[in-house]
Curated annotation (Swiss-Prot):
Protein name (Swiss-Prot/TrEMBL): Rho GTPase-activating protein gacY
Region (Disordered): 1-325
Name of the encoding gene: gacY
Organism of origin: Dictyostelium discoideum
GO biological-process terms attached to the record: small GTPase-mediated signal transduction
Acidic residues bias: start-end ranges: 169-181
């Protein structure tokens, strides 16, 4: 079977044998054609079967070629036999099972083109079409080369189409249905997509006739050029061909296919599925801008560039695989433009050259006067291994320094660091007008510092920022990328900074450590745990600032004073000093004239510690050493072991306190304060029972004094200094 036809199948009526049909076909080939086909008797269910005529049903438009032509040739159609269906005939019709034929229609209306199942069960007779019965006009001679096509010439006995074949002189395939559509052009998209549902096939409303209502324009002057099946690029099985031709179920011998004369865009459509439609290729027009005076006037720079490129010697280029047909303006766009970044490269080169010049000068010079200011220095590495650079702006007297040398010194410090990732801690504490550099100098620094300064900067911490520094950064907002603002962190409290970097590593000056922003309330020192006081941001050393200042004051002015720590100072002055320290003020003890007031302030601090300098859990151990019968060296070793068990904060304060008391003992000949007298004064403040029982405290007072005296007598051994 030829592959150009759609596959269709049907069931033979009961009692019909395919061998009988083949035998009848052979007899018809050997006999002369009859004027009309003989009626075939209806097979009986209880008798021997007789051959039933082969039904050839044509689905599609039934418009006659004679009706289309302007001057139809008169023909004498043969009378079509009519049959009256009976109950058996109805049953036979119901036995036909035609496969739904795919019709080239959108999916939404495809169901309307299917064969209604109840059509074959209609008891009305099949309406004749004017000549013969259904399929009688589709007579096709059997090709000489096809000897195995069984049943293709069953209708050769019907001679009622001979006149029609003679009248159509331009037809060479003797296929009337194909000729009916030979002058029909391909349907357009609008005619197919806008077809109303009421114009679809409906056999019941058309009295049993099957029609295809596709709007087509008949071209009378096309002749036979557009006839035959389409053989375009879609192939012989294209569904587009079935839209313009009748759909046949039954036997039919097709003629050789011919190409359809359709437009290029229509031939690319393989189906009505819009998702697979190939769009027409875009059309480009060549425009020569040189022929447009107004364009040349408006684009003089582009024309000059093109002329210069034409004058320059062309370098041999590799042959391109595909030559572009675009010319004129589009050629100028597609051609490789000159490097527009040349100016930027020169600008970057000038900046780098200037930076390299400063770097060379910085390596060949020394800056002792700037180095003594200590306004910029590396401070080790953070926990991620990044170098920390600390800048203290208040240490740089701008008005008194040569800022060019300051820039050279800054480059000498920063250049080895910025090769890798680094972190910058900028301390803006205590800034005033004498420390603020000019905007021109800051802009110059920003311009000279090359990309590695900005790229490798992973964190910028601004300590104690003011409105001026925030305003200055706002000015440079348009020159800074969004990544810079993600690296920026404002630090108002040093405690937040010390959570990121160790206090000892940053080594900030005391003036910075003691700074407290305005409006921030300080926590009290007296009565607070020793460890908390030491870890506060405003406490720069390893001991409370109160003790640090007090010991320094007494070392200068109190070692020669008789009765130091034994005599009490003015209670009002002690209270005033305590309030100043608790409020976070920078108390200057040099203004205090009475030495005993400062000594009393230190004893008050030790007395109000929530946990004594020698903790409660070691109280019994100290008492046992004093009560024991060990030798003095053994007791010293035991004390050394207990002192090593002290917390770090307690150990640091004990070391500073007893070191100072050792100096007092050294001057005991003047101040009358030996180890015995000092033990009586400090023992109750250094070692106490947690229970706080007065009777036990009185009973253990002697042993407490003895253990403190033993420590004072062996300060050098116990504290290793």
């Amino acid at each position: 079977m030829d592959s150009s036809f759609k596959r269709a199948s049907f069931k033979l009526p009961p009692g019909v044998n395919i061998d009988n049909i083949n035998e009848m076909n052979n007899n018809n080939m050997n006999t002369a054609p009859a004027p009309a086909p003989a009626p075939i008797p209806t097979p009986q269910p209880t008798t021997t079967t007789t051959t039933a005529p082969q039904r050839k049903v044509t689905f599609g438009s039934r418009v006659r070629a004679q009706e289309i032509n302007a001057t139809p040739t008169p023909t004498t159609p043969a009378p079509a036999p009519t049959t009256t269906p009976s109950e058996n005939d109805t049953a036979k019709k119901d036995d036909f099972d035609f496969d739904p034929v795919p019709v080239s229609r959108p999916r939404a209306t495809r169901a309307a083109t299917m064969i209604p199942s109840n059509m074959l069960g209609d008891k009305r007779p099949i309406r004749p079409l004017g000549k013969g019965f259904i399929g009688a006009d589709r007579q096709t001679p059997k090709p000489e080369t096809d000897n195995n096509n069984n049943g293709n010439n069953n209708n050769n006995n019907n001679n009622n189409d001979n006149n029609n074949n003679n009248n159509n002189n331009d037809d060479d395939d003797e296929d009337e249905d194909d000729d009916e559509y030979s002058n029909v052009s391909a349907p357009s998209w609008n005619s197919v997509l806008s077809k109303a549902k009421t114009n679809t096939m409906n056999s019941r409303k058309r009295s049993g006739m099957i029609h295809d209502f596709v709007d087509v324009n008949i071209k009378n002057d096309s002749g036979g050029e557009n006839s035959a099946n389409t053989t375009s690029e879609d192939g012989s099985s294209s569904r587009r061909g079935t839209l313009r031709k009748a759909i046949v179920i039954g036997t039919h011998n097709p003629q050789p296919q011919q190409e359809d004369d359709v437009e290029e865009t229509t031939s690319r459509i393989s189906s009505l599925d819009l998702a697979n439609v190939q769009r027409p290729r875009p059309q480009y027009h060549t425009i020569d801008p040189a022929s447009i005076p107004q364009w040349k006037k408006n684009n003089e720079d582009l024309v000059n560039t093109m002329e210069q490129q034409q004058q320059q010697p062309q370098q041999p280029q590799q042959p391109q695989q595909q030559q572009s047909t675009v010319g004129g303006l589009f050629n100028s766009i597609l051609k490789k433009q000159p490097n527009n970044n040349a100016n930027n490269a020169q600008r970057l080169t000038r900046a780098e050259a200037e930076y390299n010049e400063y770097l060379t000068k910085s390596k060949s010079q020394r800056f002792p006067e700037i180095e003594a200011l200590n306004f910029i220095y590396p401070a080790g590495k953070d926990n991620l291994g990044r170098t920390i650079i600390v800048i203290i702006a208040s240490h740089l007297p701008v008005r008194e320094m040569d800022m060019e040398r300051v820039l050279l010194y800054t480059i000498s410090i920063m250049d080895p660091v910025v090769e890798e990732e680094y972190v910058l801690v900028y301390v803006h504490t205590n800034m005033n007008n004498s420390n603020k550099p000019s905007m021109a100098w800051m802009k110059k620094v920003y311009t000279i510092f090359n990309r590695k300064y900005k790229k490798n900067l992973k964190g910028l911490y601004i300590v104690h920022p003011t409105t001026w520094i925030k305003f200055t950064l706002g000015i440079f907002k348009h020159f800074l990328s969004s990544k810079f603002w993600k690296k920026l962190t404002y630090i108002d409290d040093l405690g937040e900074l010390f959570k990121t970097f160790p206090r000892e590593q940053l080594a900030l000056p005391n003036a910075i450590m003691m700074h407290r922003p305005a409006g921030k309330k300080s926590q009290p020192i007296f009565g607070a745990p020793l460890e908390d006081v030491i870890n506060r941001p405003d406490n720069p050393g390893e001991i409370p600032v109160l003790f640090e200042k007090g010991i320094a004051y007494l070392s200068r002015r109190g070692l020669q004073v008789e009765g130091l720590f034994r005599l009490s100072g003015a209670n009002s002055q002690i209270k005033s000093l305590r309030q100043g320290f608790d409020q976070g003020e920078d108390v200057d003890l040099e203004d205090v004239e009475d030495v005993h007031t400062v000594a009393g302030l230190l004893k008050l601090y030790l007395r109000e510690l929530p946990s004594p300098l020698f903790p409660f859990d070691l109280y019994s151990s100290f008492i046992e050493i004093s009560k024991g019968e060990q030798t003095k060296p053994q007791k010293v070793e035991s004390l050394k072991l207990l002192l090593s068990l002290l917390p770090p904060a307690n150990k640091a304060l004990s070391k500073h306190l007893f070191k100072f008391l050792g100096k007092v003992i050294e001057n005991s000949s003047v101040n009358k304060m030996n180890s015995v007298n000092l033990s009586i004064v400090f023992a109750p403040n250094l070692l106490k029972d947690k229970e706080g029982n007065v009777m036990d405290a009185v009973a253990d007072a002697q042993f407490v004094n003895q253990v403190v005296q033993l420590i004072l007598d062996n300060i050098n051994i116990l504290f290793n200094y």
